[in-house]
Amino acid sequence: MSVPLILTLLAGAATFIGAFLGVLGQKPSNRMLAFSLGFAAGIMLLISLMEMLPAALDTEGMSPVLGYGMFIIGLLGYFGLDRLLPHAHPQDLVQKRQQPLPGSIKRTAILLTLGISLHNFPEGIATFVTASSNLELGFGIALAVALHNIPEGLAVAGPVYAATGSKRTAIFWAGISGMAEILGGVLAWLILGSLVSPIVMAAIMAAVAGIMVALSVDELMPLAKEIDPNNNPSYGVLCGMSIMGLSLVILQTIGIG
């Protein structure tokens, strides 16, 4: 099994960590969840804008028009799907968790699971494509994806467990979203394995960079602010950027990058 596929599997499996936290009652503080989301956004922004997009543009034979065009397609594609596909957000469950409406909570959790699955699927593809092009960047993307999968698993499993009383059901529904990400990675492994053209991989990587930027600014940062409105998510973003940037420098210095 290839390393990029393993990274994708591990990133998707992080959803189960949140699911177990949701059913065991050991919920992390809102401040910690918000910081982790900001941290993940910082990693994604730095890698997308400072590494993935420049690497795609520097590929031999890649024109700036195609490179930036694919980046914009990734941006607009994410925003378009996010607006067209009705889905709930994790904060919806956080707000409804205190309401004595178990059936309503369960329905919302199921809708949330389906919505998260829809955007986790391309994340699995993005993780695999990035790791296939540059293993160093793949580690960073996998870490960022895993960090924001944990609160997603928690947001689904906790309310479902409260509504049904079944830990197995709660973990099942939370795990579906993680499995969607793994499925995306597996399909990318099966389909993209035959696409050996560097230009094709560079174009896909530019589009993935656009998706990651959109995900960071439209999903992760606003969600971090809603979970913990008393603290600025920018601290987590800056911390994620700084640590990721430092790690990239260290890896390149020792010859791994």
Curated annotation (Swiss-Prot):
<feature type="transmembrane region" description="Helical">
    <location>
        <begin position="171"/>
        <end position="191"/>
    </location>
</feature>
<feature type="binding site" description="M2 metal binding site">
    <location>
        <position position="181"/>
    </location>
    <ligand>
        <name>Fe(2+)</name>
    </ligand>
</feature>
<dbReference type="InterPro" id="IPR003689">
    <property type="entry name" value="ZIP"/>
</dbReference>
<keyword id="KW-0408">Iron</keyword>
<keyword id="KW-0864">Zinc transport</keyword>
<feature type="transmembrane region" description="Helical">
    <location>
        <begin position="195"/>
        <end position="215"/>
    </location>
</feature>
<feature type="transmembrane region" description="Helical">
    <location>
        <begin position="109"/>
        <end position="129"/>
    </location>
</feature>
<dbReference type="Pfam" id="PF02535">
    <property type="entry name" value="Zip"/>
</dbReference>
<keyword id="KW-0479">Metal-binding</keyword>
<feature type="binding site" description="M2 metal binding site">
    <location>
        <position position="152"/>
    </location>
    <ligand>
        <name>Fe(2+)</name>
    </ligand>
</feature>
<feature type="transmembrane region" description="Helical">
    <location>
        <begin position="33"/>
        <end position="53"/>
    </location>
</feature>
<feature type="binding site" description="M2 metal binding site">
    <location>
        <position position="123"/>
    </location>
    <ligand>
        <name>Fe(2+)</name>
    </ligand>
</feature>
<feature type="transmembrane region" description="Helical">
    <location>
        <begin position="61"/>
        <end position="81"/>
    </location>
</feature>
<keyword id="KW-0812">Transmembrane</keyword>
<keyword id="KW-0472">Membrane</keyword>
<keyword id="KW-0997">Cell inner membrane</keyword>
<feature type="binding site" description="M1 metal binding site">
    <location>
        <position position="148"/>
    </location>
    <ligand>
        <name>Zn(2+)</name>
    </ligand>
</feature>
<dbReference type="GO" id="GO:0005385">
    <property type="term" value="F:zinc ion transmembrane transporter activity"/>
</dbReference>
<keyword id="KW-0862">Zinc</keyword>
<feature type="binding site" description="M1 metal binding site">
    <location>
        <position position="152"/>
    </location>
    <ligand>
        <name>Zn(2+)</name>
    </ligand>
</feature>
<dbReference type="GO" id="GO:0046872">
    <property type="term" value="F:metal ion binding"/>
</dbReference>
<keyword id="KW-1003">Cell membrane</keyword>
<protein>
    <recommendedName>
        <fullName>Zinc transporter ZupT</fullName>
    </recommendedName>
</protein>
<dbReference type="GO" id="GO:0005886">
    <property type="term" value="C:plasma membrane"/>
</dbReference>
<feature type="transmembrane region" description="Helical">
    <location>
        <begin position="137"/>
        <end position="157"/>
    </location>
</feature>
<dbReference type="InterPro" id="IPR023498">
    <property type="entry name" value="Zn_transptr_ZupT"/>
</dbReference>
<keyword id="KW-0813">Transport</keyword>
<comment type="similarity">
    <text>Belongs to the ZIP transporter (TC 2.A.5) family. ZupT subfamily.</text>
</comment>
<feature type="transmembrane region" description="Helical">
    <location>
        <begin position="236"/>
        <end position="256"/>
    </location>
</feature>
<feature type="binding site" description="M1 metal binding site">
    <location>
        <position position="123"/>
    </location>
    <ligand>
        <name>Zn(2+)</name>
    </ligand>
</feature>
<feature type="binding site" description="M2 metal binding site">
    <location>
        <position position="120"/>
    </location>
    <ligand>
        <name>Fe(2+)</name>
    </ligand>
</feature>
<comment type="function">
    <text>Mediates zinc uptake. May also transport other divalent cations.</text>
</comment>
<feature type="binding site" description="M2 metal binding site">
    <location>
        <position position="149"/>
    </location>
    <ligand>
        <name>Fe(2+)</name>
    </ligand>
</feature>
<feature type="transmembrane region" description="Helical">
    <location>
        <begin position="5"/>
        <end position="25"/>
    </location>
</feature>
<keyword id="KW-0406">Ion transport</keyword>
<keyword id="KW-1133">Transmembrane helix</keyword>
